[in-house]
């Protein structure tokens, strides 16, 4: 049986107005059981909405540590996290997983010429240091 994608994305409601506390609270809300109309206590995750996606504003655009020609990647191609609003992305991902949620975030390649050429900014087998996450070039 085919089901449509189900989950929550930060951009749809908050745009750039996000921070770690807000996203962690959203995660907690997705697993909170509530009773509606006298029925059995149910959470959004019980209904299949178990994916949380952080869209934009986790990265440090315009960082002084950014590589020449880049907006938020260092010289090795690693994204630079905005530690003011997301002090610990690993803790946030761990929190999602402790709640049995899946989580992810939007990562765009830079510069635009690389995107146009369908090139990978980083080594395709690079493993993110804070989470076992592989970055691959899209098809």
Which functions belong to the PLM regions below?
Residues 26, 30-139:
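Aromatic-lined carbohydrate-binding/catalytic grooves of carbohydrate-active enzymes
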Residues 1-32:
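N-terminal module-boundary/linker segments of secreted carbohydrate-active enzymes
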């Amino acid at each position: 049986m085919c089901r449509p994608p189900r989950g929550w994305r930060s951009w749809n409601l908050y745009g750039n107005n996000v921070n770690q506390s807000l996203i962690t609270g959203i995660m907690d809300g997705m697993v909170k059981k509530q009773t509606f109309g006298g029925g059995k206590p149910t959470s959004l995750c019980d209904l299949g909405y178990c994916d949380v996606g952080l869209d934009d504003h986790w990265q440090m655009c315009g960082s002084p540590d950014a590589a020449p020609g880049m907006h938020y990647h260092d010289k090795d191609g690693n994204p630079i996290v905005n530690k003011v609003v997301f002090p610990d992305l690993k803790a946030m991902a761990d929190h999602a997983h402790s709640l049995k949620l899946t989580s992810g975030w939007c990562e765009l390649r830079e510069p635009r010429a690389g995107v146009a050429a369908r090139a990978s900014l980083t080594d395709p087998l690079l493993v993110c240091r804070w989470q076992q996450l592989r970055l691959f070039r899209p098809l």
